[in-house]
Amino acid sequence: MSSRKVRVKKLNVKTTLPVLREDQIDPNEYEALTTDNQIATGVEQAEENEYHLQTILKEAGTSNDQEIPVPPPQESDINYDDLYPVPFHKPSSYIRFSQTVEECITCLYDMTTEDDEFLKQYNSKPPATGVLSEDDFEHIMEVFEDTAAEQTPFAAVDNTVAAYDMMLPGLTHLNQSVSTDVLQHAKPVYEYWKSRRQEAGNKPLHPSLKFETHQETDDTDPFVCFRRREARQTRKTRARDNKIAETLKKLRRELEDGRQLVLLAYEREMVKREVMSMDRAIFEERARLKDMKLRLGIKGEDEDLVNQKPQKRKPVEPPVVRQPTGAHLRQPVRSDGRTLDADLVLLSDKLAEKETELRLDIEMKVQNHRKWNQNHIDLTREPLSPVKEQGTEVKFRQAKTQYLMTPPASTSSEMEVDEIAPDAMQLDKRESSVFQFTAGSGEQSKGSQPAFRRRIGRLNRLWIDRRGMVTPPRELGEDRSDRWKYDSDSDDEEPPVYEVDPFDTRALKFRATIPLNPYMFRGRPAVPPEAVAAAQAQAGNRVLPSPAAAAAHAHAQAHAQAAAAAHLAAQAQAKAQAVAQQQAQAAQGV
């Protein structure tokens, strides 16, 4: 027999279950449900028929040897009859119910139009006992409704009608509280009530809340109250548990803070109470003292009878330590007679030593480089730059202008390009004002001034490099106006600035390949073809210098290198002598 592996779904309120009697159950199906193979073993299907496992399962269902240890009942020594009185009365603090006056003393059933017509028809032929009033009719109908709701609560489902005998206890109680004989009119009213209930589907005549009775019919009924809903089980996760724990911790912390605040407020009020009692006692004693002074005729100041404003305490000044005079001061000295300051190393001395070592290292490398190139002729221009004392400086210089009161002399017209221009005349210098305003630092204004540099290029061509020149404005045409179509004028984002060394080899090579702007050729006359051809012919005639000129240039270069080496050697010797003198002076001081 194969085991049943059907997963049973969870029951809910909408699941339809058949109700079967004992004789309607199939014996084979019942045996399949109660067989041992249907027990959840927790192992694989192929191993469920294992001998030892089946033996354990059979013994688990038939063995009665195992007993659950349960503590035996013990008689209590507490006598509740002596501790608690027998007549128990509920305290008035319990909440019982809250109803209106009409709900307590009047009838809850209200007559309808059909009830009014029936009552008029019934009173048209009154019995010997008299007519039936409207209040008595409502009381009788209320007894019928309450009894039917209590005895047959599911009358609307199984169509059960409460018999007249069930109404007699309620009618008897009503007959005792009403002055008229209600039982004489109860039977005709019961028949009328029964017909009305059957017309309404055996539902209560009195308006009440409509509850859910059938899943399919009442699912879309808007008047149904308190629908049954399947409670979906929430999945617990670790994050949810942590959140609940944090919430509980926060709640406990807040409650503890509130408790501490209450305790502190209580202590504050108790201190205020003590202060008020002390103030009152002081006031009473002062009043008594004043009466005693008046009685004894003592005249004097009444400062003790008035609360004086406390004076501010002066801050305690720290004690001043007197230093001894200069005659008694002695500078601490060592055992060998030197002062302690002699062992201190100054930062300037350390920096000077590092700079000296660095310069000596550079000079040593320069000398080694010259030794390596001693038997070689280097035709490059300035192969090894000499060491400068003031650091490397850019060979740019500012263009200085001056006013000439007279026509220029022959010396000014014959001035060399590399000569330093004379200082400006006093006419250019402005008088210093008392109040001055500068838009920026002097470095910025200095950088904005134009500067020029002269250099000789290939084939002995003279080049003039300019810096700080004003760029002419660009003219926007139709072909360039669309370039700024999608640009934003927002000042929030500043354009990136890329720091580039203008004298870098790659930067110079890139600038050499940039085509010239068209505005540079604007307004210039056209060059005739004859001049272009003559310039090309002249350039073609230029050749490299002759071997004699190259040899003369190499000789001059070697002579310059030897002079520079002698100069560096003299400087190194002078520095070495200075260092030796310093060491000798230090040794004499020791």
Swiss-Prot record:
Pfam families reported for this sequence: EPL1
GO biological process: DNA repair; regulation of transcription by RNA polymerase II
Main subcellular localisation: nucleus
Assigned GO CC terms: NuA4 histone acetyltransferase complex; nucleus
UniProt-annotated location(s): Nucleus
Keywords carried by this UniProt record: Cell cycle, DNA damage, DNA repair, Nucleus, Transcription, Transcription regulation
Biased composition (Basic and acidic residues): 475-488
Region (Disordered), start-end ranges: 302-335, 471-497
Domain of life: Eukaryota
Purpose of the protein: Component of the NuA4 histone acetyltransferase complex which is involved in transcriptional activation of selected genes principally by acetylation of nucleosomal histone H4 and H2A. The NuA4 complex is also involved in DNA repair. Involved in gene silencing by neighboring heterochromatin, blockage of the silencing spreading along the chromosome, and required for cell cycle progression through G2/M.
Family under the similarity heading: Belongs to the enhancer of polycomb family.
Quaternary organization: Component of the NuA4 histone acetyltransferase complex.
Protein name (database record): Enhancer of polycomb-like protein 1
Gene for this chain: EPL1
